């Protein structure tokens, strides 16, 4: 059973500490994945103002966020300027590339995108993508081939903005199957590879403890579905690293074979069905996100 393995890298600490550990774990398991990197300033601590929202406050309590992520991540970019991730830690991104993993853009400013993508102008959306693409392509030494919107904050405007960058595919939404979004002019856009499996932080809480997560998530894979799983360098690369190592071992025993997302694309991309990305909601995740329709 083939499955896509996606690793989102949102923060400075996730890049500095989580990525090297994940690369070692993946090398041990002989597994390749897709890394989506945030490359601009780490301003993730600015999400703390969202604690006034009951859904976000409950998510932080449910996942025990301070223990899960660490205070340096939760406070990054609040009382001081956010550290420039790509400028300081670009060699770790090249290390992932040299190890044979697929590399794509997550965001220039992860917090900025997640907080503002829903109301930025078309020009602002394009400028944010442009900054991220320019930075990551300079780091890698070649064009960026894929992207994944931070926090799955994507809709048809985001889809349209990304068309100018010539990506091979995007992974901007939650959904159940590969598709090509229908654009405003009636043409079909860049292929989308949705995520169909929940993330660790979406399901951990009073009814599911961390040590039971592997049983839960491995039970969600099925032969007749997409099977795209997302992990975070800030979680599975740090505090839950041992759990991820065991997940890979058990997945292999169950016949689940992980691969970079790009390997899920068919040879004839033009034959993929059409679809849309609309704003929706998902249990365990605060705020809106892009969903396949």
Curated annotation (Swiss-Prot):
Keywords noted in UniProt: Antibiotic resistance, Hydrolase, Lipid A biosynthesis, Lipid biosynthesis, Lipid metabolism, Lipopolysaccharide biosynthesis
One GO CC annotation: membrane
Gene3D superfamilies: Glycoside hydrolase/deacetylase
Pfam families (alphabetical): Polysacc_deac_1 (PF01522)
Catalytic reactions on record: 4-deoxy-4-formamido-alpha-L-arabinopyranosyl di-trans,octa-cis-undecaprenyl phosphate + H2O = 4-amino-4-deoxy-alpha-L-arabinopyranosyl di-trans,octa-cis-undecaprenyl phosphate + formate
Biological pathway: Glycolipid biosynthesis; 4-amino-4-deoxy-alpha-L-arabinose undecaprenyl phosphate biosynthesis; 4-amino-4-deoxy-alpha-L-arabinose undecaprenyl phosphate from UDP-4-deoxy-4-formamido-beta-L-arabinose and undecaprenyl phosphate: step 2/2; Bacterial outer membrane biogenesis; lipopolysaccharide biosynthesis
Positions of the NodB homology domain: 1-259
EC number(s) recorded for this UniProt protein: 3.5.1.n3
Gene Ontology MF terms in the entry: hydrolase activity, acting on carbon-nitrogen (but not peptide) bonds, in linear amides
GO process terms (BP): 4-amino-4-deoxy-alpha-L-arabinopyranosyl undecaprenyl phosphate biosynthetic process; lipid A biosynthetic process; lipopolysaccharide biosynthetic process; response to antibiotic
UniProt key word rRNA-binding: no
Function field: Catalyzes the deformylation of 4-deoxy-4-formamido-L-arabinose-phosphoundecaprenol to 4-amino-4-deoxy-L-arabinose-phosphoundecaprenol. The modified arabinose is attached to lipid A and is required for resistance to polymyxin and cationic antimicrobial peptides.
Family: Belongs to the polysaccharide deacetylase family. ArnD deformylase subfamily.
Identification of the protein by name: Probable 4-deoxy-4-formamido-L-arabinose-phosphoundecaprenol deformylase ArnD
Organism in which the protein naturally occurs: Pseudomonas syringae pv. syringae (strain B728a)
Lineage: Bacteria, Pseudomonadati, Pseudomonadota, Gammaproteobacteria, Pseudomonadales
